């Protein structure tokens, strides 16, 4: 499972990094976090968390600095968080999280992306009840049992710890993600491959042939939208 999360980050960086989309999206997220609090990660935990994730995605320093400098200025640009839910082929389900300065534009774009790529957008709650929100932490290691004990001793609400292919994956209650990261740091973990709040499907479906091709095109269309921050789904192997 650790390899799965690391591969997701690597594939996203490889796909989006070529045209700087991932950098632009992180720029918006960093700006919003810095604007809502202090533009200093030491006194702004939300900003610190975003910067940690930006580092994992290899976002260049100049992009980060530009977003923080923008937040320090007098700009009044406002971004709104949103969530959209929908369906793809053969039982596939999708959740899309957005950060946008124009909600009407975003809703129209996503509806078009679903409609043109074999899917359809559903009502709020039509999909999310089949997913669970969890903190996901991945780092190099192989001893799941000792990590589990370490987190329990730190009073972290840890749901599961898995070790596979040289990586440890920790699942926490969403409210304990940040505390879990700090507990692991205190225990000697210096670098993290993944630190994310994720929507984990309660069950997965397997797609093949044309269904898989259609689904991949749908995911690409959604992720290519500038206002989309995250896309979650229940398809195995992707």
Curated annotation (Swiss-Prot):
Similarity field: Belongs to the TACO1 family. YeeN subfamily.
A GO biological-process term: regulation of DNA-templated transcription
Protein's cellular compartments: Cytoplasm
InterPro entries: Integrase-like_N (IPR017856), TACO1_YebC-like_2nd/3rd_dom (IPR048300), TACO1_YebC_N (IPR049083), Transcrip_reg_TACO1-like (IPR002876), Transcrip_reg_TACO1-like_dom3 (IPR026564), Transcrip_reg_TACO1_YeeN (IPR026562), YebC-like (IPR029072)
Keyword entries, A-Z: Cytoplasm, DNA-binding, Transcription, Transcription regulation
One MF term in the entry's GO annotations: DNA binding
Protein name stated in the entry: Probable transcriptional regulatory protein SMU_1789c
One cellular component term from this protein's GO annotations in UniProt: cytosol
Highest taxon above the source species: Bacteria
